């Protein structure tokens, strides 16, 4: 998340979504979300710092998505973005006053201990509950861990606004499954072992791969799979997930797995007992 200003002094927020083209002479094209979008027109320049500016190219969607050009000093755009940007926290976590201590804390905590590759617009938050110590204890108890790469997309934040859920358009999210992970998961299924997904994006990744190949295969692909009742799961048996926003696709996914009435009863109990919801909140184990 980048905060900058137009030459008029107007404050503009630029939320990076995905890289659209490779760097050429300190320039890159990205798809972004701009707020407030109405203040921006094609060729508007948004200055982030002395080493980074953003030029609007064209509007992609009415919800504020734009194609922009990043203009920066140096040859490593990620270094520039890390110096000038902030962790892309969900909109319900407010950081009204710039605070370097909070920025450092969010950078450390708003990503999993096993995170490696750049690419997500948000953390796969179910994984935030795991420490290296917990993962080691699970392995010592005979739990086999398989890792997939998830590029969590903007759709994570978007509510369903259609009267008919079948008309909702899911945003695409990219993922990667390694040969090792594919072998682990297929072997576990063949042996009748339970597959426990950590997070809803993991669910969509594995179910998408199975739908495409009939099993889990190593691949670098994307998912537009919208899971809602009465979806029949092919890969996952259990799920570790946080408590989700109302009207979200994630709430529909967990309802497909556990049943709407069961999930709503669980949420009612969570509210009565003051559980923490959303990204930095508590989680549930659905089995």
Question: What spans do the regions from the language model cover?
Answer:
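Surface-exposed, charge/polar-rich loops and edge strands
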Residues: 1-287
């Amino acid at each position: 998340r980048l905060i900058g200003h137009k030459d008029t002094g107007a404050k503009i927020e630029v939320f990076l979504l995905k890289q659209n083209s490779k760097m050429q002479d300190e320039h890159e094209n990205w798809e972004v979300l701009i707020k407030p979008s109405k203040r921006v027109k094609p060729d508007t320049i948004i200055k982030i710092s002395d080493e980074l500016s953003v030029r609007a190219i064209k509007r992609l969607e009415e919800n504020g998505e734009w194609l922009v050009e990043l203009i920066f000093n140096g040859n490593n755009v990620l270094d520039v973005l890390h110096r000038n940007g902030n962790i892309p926290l969900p909109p319900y976590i407010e950081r009204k006053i710039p605070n370097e201590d909070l920025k450092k804390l969010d950078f450390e905590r708003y990503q999993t201990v096993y995170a490696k590759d750049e690419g997500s617009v948000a953390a796969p938050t179910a994984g935030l509950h795991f420490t290296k110590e917990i993962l080691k204890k699970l392995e010592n108890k005979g739990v086999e861990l398989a890792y997939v790469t998830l590029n969590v997309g903007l759709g994570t934040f978007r509510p369903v606004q259609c009267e008919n859920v079948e008309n909702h358009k899911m945003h695409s999210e990219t993922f990667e499954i390694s040969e090792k992970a594919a072998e682990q998961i297929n072997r576990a299924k063949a042996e009748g072992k339970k597959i426990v997904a950590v997070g809803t994006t993991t669910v969509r990744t594995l179910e998408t791969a199975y739908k495409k190949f009939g099993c889990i295969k190593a691949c670098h692909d994307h998912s537009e799979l919208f899971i809602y009742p009465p979806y029949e799961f092919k890969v996952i048996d259990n799920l570790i997930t946080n408590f989700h926003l109302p009207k979200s696709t994630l709430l529909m996914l967990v309802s497909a797995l556990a049943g709407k009435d069961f999930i709503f009863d669980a949420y009612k109990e969570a509210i009565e007992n003051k559980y923490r919801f959303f990204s930095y909140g508590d989680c549930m184990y659905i089995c």
